[in-house]
Amino acid sequence: MLVCYSVLACEILWDLPCSIMGSPLGHFTWDKYLKETCSVPAPVHCFKQSYTPPSNEFKISMKLEAQDPRNTTSTCIATVVGLTGARLRLRLDGSDNKNDFWRLVDSAEIQPIGNCEKNGGMLQPPLGFRLNASSWPMFLLKTLNGAEMAPIRIFHKEPPSPSHNFFKMGMKLEAVDRKNPHFICPATIGEVRGSEVLVTFDGWRGAFDYWCRFDSRDIFPVGWCSLTGDNLQPPGTKVVIPKNPYPASDVNTEKPSIHSSTKTVLEHQPGQRGRKPGKKRGRTPKTLISHPISAPSKTAEPLKFPKKRGPKPGSKRKPRTLLNPPPASPTTSTPEPDTSTVPQDAATIPSSAMQAPTVCIYLNKNGSTGPHLDKKKVQQLPDHFGPARASVVLQQAVQACIDCAYHQKTVFSFLKQGHGGEVISAVFDREQHTLNLPAVNSITYVLRFLEKLCHNLRSDNLFGNQPFTQTHLSLTAIEYSHSHDRYLPGETFVLGNSLARSLEPHSDSMDSASNPTNLVSTSQRHRPLLSSCGLPPSTASAVRRLCSRGVLKGSNERRDMESFWKLNRSPGSDRYLESRDASRLSGRDPSSWTVEDVMQFVREADPQLGPHADLFRKHEIDGKALLLLRSDMMMKYMGLKLGPALKLSYHIDRLKQGKF
């Protein structure tokens, strides 16, 4: 039985359920880590953070006002380009992606549009504005014209600062890695100096440690990421656990004094986003110093100059200016994350991750677990994994199989070393072994990977897309057929567990903001669409990838498209409409079209749409997917502009009516 960790009698820490803090999976959890290291989490009142984490209702592309992190006296226009947990990734309009930065949704440094003018200020161009400064007013006008402004209601008041510095050496917390600010990692208070604290990252050498004020917004209580949905990175892979000779309940809460030895090695617990080798430049594992942590001695390395060479004959000697050596330890906090040192797009979550498919799989605890898995351990697993990114859910599912195995080595042998994916671990032969899963590029790969693993485990009925009952069928190979599994980027998808139920979308995974009228929890509204398109249920894999975004809209959209078509029909398109009888596509069921057939249809529908035909090959859109496309999908996923998207929607509607 897992027990949530509580260390202070009078101070209630984050009220985390055991299913969050402690998990039978092999990934990192604070509950187990605190017990094994005999550590004390910093109480919530030490931080300048809300006791209840604020909700994040921002959306990508929303505009707001933000302080320029490189020139804090300037207020600029910023665009939300990324979201994670309670944080926003912002980009100043007129700047490039090398200077993106992160802010909490309750930061005082972000305000709704109009706040600066209301207070008598003026919006300024960002430092490094790429255009001529004289063009700023016109640039500002064009930027705000028609843009989506973040509403005032989704901004939150910044929490008050603690009355003074309550931190003590050895306390555990979660902290932003300022050299890679999209990472939040487990950390320890290494030293306290007045109003400042030294943040040291567990399991990594001191190159990434930094000083900050006790009221910095870059440090969080233990459990913050679990509550906000942010990704907490695991500590380094070779951390030595300090053992406390006294029970955890005997720890002095006023002055933590935890004695330790360095004999026991912590088995690495990969997090839901395992740190990938080489991801952080120059970061190598370090040995965790026994508590209380003494201040690390950071001696300045001597500057190295190129080898001295004699001057050339006739040349003049120029005096060489020596650089000032860096201070041994900074005495002031770093006000902002140093994103200028991060390579382009390295300080942000990759665009592929922003639009990554969302997956949720359920665990069948009542079915046969096969000869390799312990049924009692399977019963202790959570009922489902996700909804989360496909790579995260894949890692959780695979790690669960390893953790529940009678012999972890057997399950581990079924896996091959990949590159760029999440990390899983197993313990056998008195050693810990880690392995990178392959990078997950599509939902299709996730499905085939789990199918193959379950087949090797002889437990083919282990995972599904709905809570399991006695009538649920297993994941079958036919559902993973490569010819049917083509997916658009950024879609929401739930693993299918039977052909009969594959049309049912997962209500948690749907975008209620973008499709408020199209949300359904059963497949009844999808079946008329299937019959009108001529799609039998047995070919529903193409439907699954789009039905979670809603069914085709009503007649108003069709009337709008027909009006648009009459006004914008291109010259020569009528000739194509009349001569299409000779096309090799005529008489064939559109649902049987290949990608090449779809490209031919686009070219024949309108000559002006010809340049866009290659997009259908790029996104692997066959006949089944074509029949489900809407104008908003083509604009969002394929990058088409409104005009071509409406024209294509018009032709697709005619195709459904049998007028092609």
Swiss-Prot record:
SUPFAM superfamilies from the UniProt entry: SAM/Pointed domain, Tudor/PWWP/MBT
Compositional bias of kind Basic residues: 273-284, 305-320
A GO molecular-function annotation: chromatin binding
Domain SAM: 593-658
Gene3D superfamilies tied to this protein: 2.30.30.140, SLED domain, Transcription Factor, Ets-1
Gene Ontology biological-process entries: heterochromatin formation; negative regulation of DNA-templated transcription
PROSITE patterns per UniProt: MBT, SAM_DOMAIN
Keywords linked to the UniProt accession: Developmental protein, Nucleus, Repeat, Repressor, Transcription, Transcription regulation
Gene Ontology CC terms, in alphabetical order: nucleoplasm; nucleus
UniProt protein name: Polycomb protein SCMH1
